[in-house]
């Protein structure tokens, strides 16, 4: 019996070391993937991979160091290793760029700490666009078609020491348009430091090889890398958190986008959030401001966000509900 227990322990240790190797390999090959894409292509594909998921991050202009919730998979998977919850899941809806793309987006995310230092994440996001009308070469109407984008994946996070964690998320992305179909696999990697109210995250997003279209053209994934830093203060029942982020775009034209956000909470129940994001015009990324509210009570959460802008992000709206225990 003792031998059986020891064998199981060795098997579990082997699994953990394999996951560490997978994360390390992703971090190691990240620069190579970036340079390969930049040398192969100059136009990025699957831009929806950069969409902000979850009403909390939407209301903070995409900043995610504070997010160790159900949507950690999408923003900062390494933060999942710091979660104090046993399980956290959430579902959300977003009306994305209603004056331009008019996309209806449904998001799902989950976080599960499986041990004191390990956590796993999962996420699914589906965007549906307005119906397009098909016609043949003679102008005769055919069946209608609804373009769709989807992303689904899983991630893992490991707390190396009490204040430092690493994580990686692996996603499949697919796009179905009226004249094209694209599929790709992409990885996100994060390294997070958290101590004395300070949060610092280094990240690389959408790492992967070039996407080939049906007409054999190569397109880069919208890869980016950046650094985010935040600090939180508590005074009585109130708390205040602020963060700044710098992000550079590597897939396609090079661009830089700075962001800043703040969150006020009372008794960890009522939340008010705001953020500003300066876009990278070369990459087609607009600038916008964001506002949001949240109510968290008895494990349940309700969060809302709204974006203000002169361009594509004008009146983008997101809402989400979640449960944790």
Across the structure, where does each feature detected by a protein language model lie?
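Cleavable N-terminal export/targeting peptides
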Residues: 1-49
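Subset of outer-membrane beta-barrel
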Residues: 37-325
């Amino acid at each position: 019996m003792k031998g059986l227990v020891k064998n199981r322990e060795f098997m579990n240790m082997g699994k953990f070391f394999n996951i560490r190797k997978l994360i390390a390999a992703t971090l190691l090959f990240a620069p190579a993937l970036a340079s390969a894409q930049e040398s192969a292509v100059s136009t990025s594909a699957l831009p929806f991979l950069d969409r902000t998921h979850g009403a909390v991050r939407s209301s903070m202009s995409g900043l995610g160091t504070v997010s160790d919730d159900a949507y950690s998979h999408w923003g900062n998977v390494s933060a999942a290793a710091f979660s104090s919850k046993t399980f956290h899941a959430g579902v959300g809806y977003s009306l994305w760029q209603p004056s331009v793309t008019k996309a209806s987006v449904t998001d799902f995310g989950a976080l599960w700490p499986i041990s004191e230092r390990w956590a796993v994440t999962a996420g699914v996001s589906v965007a549906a666009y307005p119906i397009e009308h098909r016609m043949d070469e003679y102008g005769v109407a055919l069946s209608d078609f609804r373009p769709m984008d989807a992303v689904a994946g899983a991630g893992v996070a490991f707390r190396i020491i009490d204040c430092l964690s690493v994580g990686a998320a692996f996603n499949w992305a697919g796009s179905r348009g009226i004249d094209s179909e694209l599929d790709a696999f992409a990885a996100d990697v994060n390294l997070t430091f958290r101590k004395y109210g300070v949060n610092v995250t280094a990240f690389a997003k959408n790492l992967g090889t070039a996407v080939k279209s049906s007409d054999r053209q190569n397109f880069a994934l919208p890869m980016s890398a950046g650094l985010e830093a935040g600090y939180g203060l508590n005074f009585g029942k109130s708390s205040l958190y602020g963060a700044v982020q710098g992000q550079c775009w590597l897939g396609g034209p090079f661009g830089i986008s700075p962001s800043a956000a703040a969150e006020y909470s009372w008794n960890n129940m009522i939340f008010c959030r705001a953020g500003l994001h300066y876009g990278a015009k070369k990459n087609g990324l607009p600038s916008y401001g964001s506002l949001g509210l949240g109510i968290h009570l008895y494990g349940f959460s309700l969060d809302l966000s709204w974006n203000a802008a002169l361009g594509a992000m004008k009146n983008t709206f997101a809402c989400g509900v979640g449960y944790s225990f």
